[in-house]
Each structure stands twice: as C-alpha cells, then as structure tokens.
Amino acid sequence: MMLKMGAMFVLLLLFILPSSQQEGDVQARKTHLKRGFYGTLAMSTRGCSGTCHRREDGKCRGTCDCSGYSYCRCGDAHHFYRGCTCTC
C-alpha cells in the first residue's frame, strides 16, 4: 500500500514540475517582449523636439526637429496614450 502511494506521489511530481516550468518560460517571454517594445518606443523619440499637439479635429499637428535624422513627423504617441509626440 505504501509503495503504491509513493509511486503515485512520484508520478504526480513528474507531472506537476514540467507544467510549472512551462508557465515560468511563458512569463519570462512576455517580460522580454514587453521590454523590447518599450525600448523601441523610447528610441524612436530620441533626439526629437518641437511643439506637437492634438487639434480639435483629433489630428496631431506641430513642428518637429530631429537632430541626426532625415525624417521627422508629429504623430500619435502610441495606442495606450492618446497624446502626440515627435518621432524620427
């Protein structure tokens, strides 16, 4: 009887450990993707300055100056924030 209970316990551990490890891997992957997304977002506004604002019609307008970049525009910051920003 004790041998059967011990064997069931070992089987239970073998089943639980791999599934909990997979959940940790998924969380680590999500954190890595989020960090990469916000890092890219921050890089796109570096070296940019100007007056960029949302008009009454909802469009972003203003003047932007990007040092070291040939293309600079005033546009939506990103879909989580409804503001406007200069991007290069």
From Swiss-Prot:
It comes from Conus caracteristicus (Characteristic cone). One of its GO terms (molecular function) is toxin activity. Keywords: Disulfide bond, Neurotoxin, Secreted, Signal, Toxin. Residues 1-21 form the signal peptide. Its main location: secreted. It is found in: Secreted. Expressed by the venom duct. Transmembrane segments: none annotated. Residues 22-46 form a propeptide. Coiled coil: none annotated. Contains 5 disulfide bonds. Belongs to the conotoxin S superfamily. The keyword Secreted applies. The cysteine framework is VIII (C-C-C-C-C-C-C-C-C-C). GO terms for cellular component: extracellular region. The keyword DNA repair does not apply. It comes from the Eukaryota. This is Conotoxin Ca8a.
